[in-house]
Design a protein with these regions (language model features):
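An N-terminal structural lobe/cap that precedes and organizes the functional/catalytic core
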Residues: 1-22
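C-terminal, well-folded lobe of enzymatic/effector domains
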Residues: 19-158
Length: 158
């Protein structure tokens, strides 16, 4: 990818540090891609957009959803298991807000994205459970994929 060619983002140092820890792909410009692809249409500046995203990610990482991914490193993970973890974490219907995307790498299908549909408006203090779009409109393209260990041979590279 040529994400480094995209315009650099202006973020407060604390936000940039948190984003770098949460998004290792930032070193290759993934944050720029995410901003262009998803953030700029949201009507906020990059600082506010990424603060909201980091707040939601913090909530996700404190939930059983993180645990289900960790427990499936180097193993297949089904969308059914992910949806069940969302239901346990964020209430009835929450699993309908998520889908998986997978990418073929080295003869395996790796989970490359967890997509979470949100309703607007979302703020930096929004509880994730209250902003999930439970309509189930996006079914994704991946029923089962392997969760790759960071730094392993099959790791997706930008």
């Amino acid at each position: 990818h040529r994400w480094q060619a995209l315009p650099a983002l202006t973020l407060q140092p604390a936000t940039a540090d948190r984003l770098e820890a949460a998004m290792p792909g930032r070193v290759s410009g993934l944050d720029r891609h995410e901003w262009i692809r998803h953030g700029r249409c949201y009507g906020l500046e990059p600082e506010a957009y990424f603060r909201i995203a980091l707040g939601l990610l913090d909530q996700l990482n404190r939930s059983p959803v993180r645990t289900v991914f960790v427990e499936h490193i180097d193993a297949p993970l089904s969308i059914a298991a992910v949806r069940a973890a969302f239901e346990r974490s964020f209430g009835a219907g929450a699993g309908q807000a998520v889908s998986l995307r997978c990418t073929a790498v080295a003869q395996r299908r790796l989970v490359s994205e967890l997509r979470i549909r949100l309703t607007a408006p979302v703020t930096d203090s929004s509880p994730l459970a209250t902003v999930l779009d439970r309509s189930g409109s996006d079914q994704g393209d991946c029923e089962v994929g392997f969760v790759d260990r960071v730094g392993s041979e099959g790791t997706l590279r930008p």
